[in-house]
Amino acid sequence: LDNIKEGCKLLKEHLDNFNEIYLPVDPDCDGYTSAALFYNYLVDVLHYPIEKIIYHIPEGKEHGLSTIMNWFPEDGTNRLIVAIDSSSNDYEEHRSLSNRGYDILVVDHHEASKYSENATVINNQLSEKYMNKMASGVGVIYKFFECWESMYNGQSAQNYLDLVALGEISDVMQMTTSENRYICDYGLNHINNKFLRNLIKKQCYSLFGITEDKFNNNYYTNGSITQIGIAFYITPLINALIRVGNPLEKERLFQAFITPDILVPSTKRGEKGMEETICT
């Protein structure tokens, strides 16, 4: 992938200086899983302080940077924007933000006419030597961390292949490429994300024809979870909330992917004023 090593070096420079990272979340399942993979890798693997990662959940279906320019602080000095699954062709926004002092890293899979002159763009569609044009945004950010681990050592990226599989299936990526096939086969047999595990358990009757009392953890690793099952019984739940949920519900959805054990006010009948973990 073009610019991938430069992108890793750019991120490392900002992490080494404990700079603020601004993370716009694209409003679809691929966008949520992409941002969640990035956030979780930084926090869980690299132990980056959570207060240094500032994310933005859009209220509607707006994509890219044009509608959130005022969300970024005016002074971008020593700050990095990481735009995943969007923004390859936001050339004017890149120029404006660069003039304000920001460094910009774009990790994307959408078509674009050219590389931005004011951002480091990693895009499989623009990379002539990278053959997998069917990777979605979460697939490209996974390849980013594969490269990161080859440069700075590590073996943790594959632990997030469940999120990659979910995002690629939800974005209806073709599975005729060997890379996508491997990602989905491995990811669906290694379900590690707690929120995704909970969703699968709650949908076990639709997925496996069993009730929750018959469900056990073997289903996360024994090949029972299929691409069709994810596409029909998991993805629609996530997409529906992203489309029609209120801002708090969308925030809770992303939090479930990244911080499943935080306490939030209970919404259960008879538990007003009480708290529960976000992934109960």
Write out the residue ranges for each language-model feature.
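Hydrophobic helix-and-loop "lid/oligomerization" segment in the mid-to-C-terminal part
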Residues: L1-L80, N99-G101, E149-T280
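Short alpha-helices
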Residues: L37, Y115-S170
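Phosphate/diphosphate-binding loops
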Residues: L80-S96
